[in-house]
Amino acid sequence: EYETDNHSGMNVEEIAGLIFDYTSGYPFLVSRLCKLMDEEVAGSVSFPDKAAAWTKEGFLEAEKLLLSEKNTLFESLMGKLNDYPSLKRKLYSILFGGKKLVYNPDDPAVDIAVMFGFVKNDGGTLRIANRIFETRLYNYFLTTDEAQNSELFIFAPDDKLKFVQNGHLNMELV
């Protein structure tokens, strides 16, 4: 419908696929990404018109803008993490421990997270609902005081020097 009205020349199937891949159809995220592409990305230096904005690159720019903004959805997500420490621990273990947690609808924290669409039941396994939430949660957890003071963060810059030489990854060492 948008393409019919605006004639941006976008590949509708590709853009729709990207939007769904990143949002799993979460209405606020779909709407916000489209609005950002249309109003913020289009007309910028890198994307001078709607045709340039409604591309994969334009979509990725909109995603970057979305992930860096404060909005009611992300504030709600962070609020639920603070209100439900057990949910916070579960999401952390999924993201950083690779744990597969059993979906339990009787767990109040899980129940509230499902109700808000932050997580989902994927064949009996608790999963983060979409890539946008996953990335936002990664960003959040990586900037907590605990993460910043962990051995990984303290020693990572020194370890990087071992593996990256002259700006290139040394595959033999990896």
Regions found by a protein language model. Give the residues of each.
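Secondary-structure transition/turn motif
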Residues: 114, 131-132
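Residue-level marker of positions within ordered structural domains that often coincide
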Residues: 4, 118, 138, 142
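Short, amphipathic alpha-helical interaction segments positioned at domain boundaries
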Residues: 71, 133-170
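Minor-groove-contacting beta-hairpin "wing" of winged helix-turn-helix DNA-binding domains
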Residues: 125-130
